[in-house]
Amino acid sequence: MTYDSEFGSHVSLYRDRIKQVIDDSLNEHLNSMILRVDLHDPIDTENMDNPFFQPRVDSGAISRFTSALKAKLKHDKHIKTQRKDWPDSRHSTLRYAWVREYTKNRKRHYHLILCFNQDAYYHLGDYDLNRNTLRTMITTAWYSALGIPIDSSGKLVNYPPNGKYLLNRKRDNFEQTYSDLMNRVDYMTKVRTKIVGDGDRNFGCSRG
């Protein structure tokens, strides 16, 4: 099943699944922060003279990313509870949805939404390898998934403008913010930038 918008045709199932991921986050975390993030593969000409630069750009990269990010969040919780920055009960279950797309020159990238407990994480922070900000954890998780050295630019991870949505069903602006987020989701579900039939998935999401 498909539906149409200004971006053309879309996959209805993807939209339904992404909506369920967002709703699952809200059901657990009254205050949820939803982020739009883009993950890019390194281009072929980057670091060709570096013998340690052997990126793992297989289909398992996206699963390695979510696993790496979960591990970083778990470690971050441990540190913050040890330092008494967080109460023991505070946590943030990572929920996510991703779509795989290709540019006209066949460069792979992923569009994602990442869902967090806003009481634990309410902003990205700067990309700083000396600090455990959310932006740093997300960015380094992708580099780890690719198996390449982390650099000071973090340029393979993009955070689109106005890509943070703060949701709380009790707030007056909930319906409008939720609608704005779902309009943003439409960009992820478009058909025209997906490749079908190559044996790899174009979509994935967390469950429950």
Curated annotation (Swiss-Prot):
Similarity comment text for this entry: To E.coli YagK.
Protein name in UniProt: Uncharacterized protein YfjJ
Name of a matching Pfam family: YagK_YfjJ_C
Species in which this protein is naturally found: Escherichia coli (strain K12)
